[in-house]
Amino acid sequence: MSPGPPAVGGVSPPVMVPGSAPPFQPTHQYFQHHYHQTPPGKLRDRSPRLSAEMRKNRDTATSSPASSGVSIQQRRGSTTQNSGVGSIGLPVLGGRGRGVMSDGHMQRTFHEAMRQRRTSLPANSLSLNGAKVTGSSLSEAKGLIADMLMNKELPGNVASCLRAVTMLLEQRPLPLNGLLNDFGLPSVVENPYGGESMVVGASKPRISNITFSTVTSATGLPTVPAEPNKARSSSYWKTEASPSNNNEHETPVDLLRKISVSRKESGTHVDTVVTTIDGQRYDTRELDTDPDLAETAVWSFPIFQMSRKHPQTILSRLTYNIFQQAELFRIFKVSPIKFFNFFHALEKGYWEIPYHNRIHAADVLHGCYYLSAHPVRSTFLTPKTPDSVLTPPHPHHQHSSIMSQLSTLELMALFTAAAMHDYDHPGRTNAFLVQVEDKKAILYNDRSVLENHHAAESWKLLNKPENHFIENLDPAEMKRFRYLVLEYILATDLKQHFEIIMTFTERLTEIDVQVETDRLLIGKLLIKMADINSPTKPYGLHRQWTDRICEEFYEQGDDERRRGLPITPYMDRGDAQVAKLQDSFIAHVVSPLATAMNECGLLPILPGLDTSELIINMEHNHRKWKEQIELENGGSYEAQITCNGGTAVNGVIEEESASTSDSPDPRRDSPLDSDLSQ
């Protein structure tokens, strides 16, 4: 069959095939739908009526019975080649023929289609000219976003989105990205304190730091829940006239004295005597003058000395003291009766076991307070842009504390989570509960079993009407408070240890304290450091905690032996390896976290010292354990006796008064003694 007449306008005319169905005749709707152009003399009509007719004609043509008996070759029809070079064939609707368009016509058609495209749809990924984004374009984009953020009337969700886009546009080096590589850690580290494997490697893919809800806006963008923005959310910022406003030379001890004096002068006291629902009596005036509680600003806080004086109320007493110092009673109108009801019931829910008891909970709470209250030398704790919801610190402050950068709601959540974080701990590890198919492991699907249990059970306790001390929070604050508490508690699972450290080091140069997720990340670091702080304490305290964790491990080993299970490493009472346990724990778990926080200036440094006392104590304690390992491996009995002026029992060096809870000075044998005396 000879070809038909030449194509006109780039579209082949219909070709008749003997015995076939009538040729397809392009209609007005056909041109509009396929080529985005209007036949001569026609105006565009996008009315719903024509759209419906077009769909009807298309369906009729497709299902026409006349085409049912036509061969594939007949339905395909003939192809008319255009005289232009490089033409592109376009399929004809219904598959009855094929036409061609020139390159120029196709380009015009594409641009016309882009002009008609809905602006709410995702951006098209095709590029006809292959243009690339330049640095100047990025700078211009960041400038435009900065100008938009200057508008104080922007909705909260829009401002959050713009800040997130600004961070994505930043391209800065990550100085601590390879920090974990410096420790020579293997890809998988066995957790000596839990018997589980911890993965050391690249962090998970970057997750947006914005929490989106369902798509409800007219533009198709997901909405962002607005952050509570109340005066009290940033009320921990102190004015110059505030009695608790510190200068660069003040210490938290000075602040405690000022707060106490100010409280007495103003008469702003909670009820003098509070009696809980179970009859426990608290005298708040006595709590305000407790000499042990006056030492909360010291890292070597005498926790065991206080526990001997108040064995059943140590956690509630310490929590009251810290809440008072942070002025949380006044800011959130906390009921003293409900406060003591909850925290006393909470401490009663801790088991009488060697390590994971109410003393450990109080120690973690103290660690969170110490790390957040002392000034640190981190550069990213200063607000970076003028649209911050937080008031900037005093311009003459050389250093700022983490406490001054967190909202009071975040502070209360951090302190509450620290007190709750090991509630109802049975003295067994997650791995043990999974292995014996404990009901808690079944309930939480073997994932963060104990951490989920602590969070769920302690929150149930808090929700009791007589314990609900957060009753004056509004719904948004309540939701945020619960979210923060759960995140902080779940972060104490050591299986997340390296993931949190990697996330922090990767975001180090981008961290902005105005961003909720960055403040949450800092809070996770604080509670994690407080939870494993034992090796960073003076040796006297560290040795007491070591004896306690070993005894709890031995009890699990005894249980495993009774059940006929393999005994977890370091938990066999007949094969004590205390020095190796602590060496592994410090090298693989504590040191990476402490070093990362110290490198970025998140650990407090006392006046007169070049580095944090936590790092000094950790290195000192680690050296002592490594020396003991060397002696156990090859040292003589006489060498063990004379080492460090201590005595040796069964090959284990014991310094005098170091491992007894009656030691009057918890700083005994600390390398800081000589430094501070100088």
From Swiss-Prot:
Protein name in UniProt: Probable 3',5'-cyclic phosphodiesterase pde-3
Annotated family: Belongs to the cyclic nucleotide phosphodiesterase family.
Cofactor: how and how many bound: Binds 2 divalent metal cations per subunit. Site 1 may preferentially bind zinc ions, while site 2 has a preference for magnesium and/or manganese ions.
Family matches, as Pfam families: PDEase_I (PF00233)
Region (Disordered): 1-27, 52-95, 223-250, 654-678
Residues the entry annotates as binding a divalent metal cation 1: H360, H421, D422, D531
PROSITE patterns hit by this protein: PDEASE_I_1 (PS00126), PDEASE_I_2 (PS51845)
Molecular-function GO terms, alphabetical: 3',5'-cyclic-AMP phosphodiesterase activity; 3',5'-cyclic-GMP phosphodiesterase activity; metal ion binding
Keywords: cGMP, Hydrolase, Metal-binding
Cited PANTHER family: CYCLIC NUCLEOTIDE PHOSPHODIESTERASE
Gene3D superfamilies: 3'5'-cyclic nucleotide phosphodiesterase, catalytic domain (1.10.1300.10)
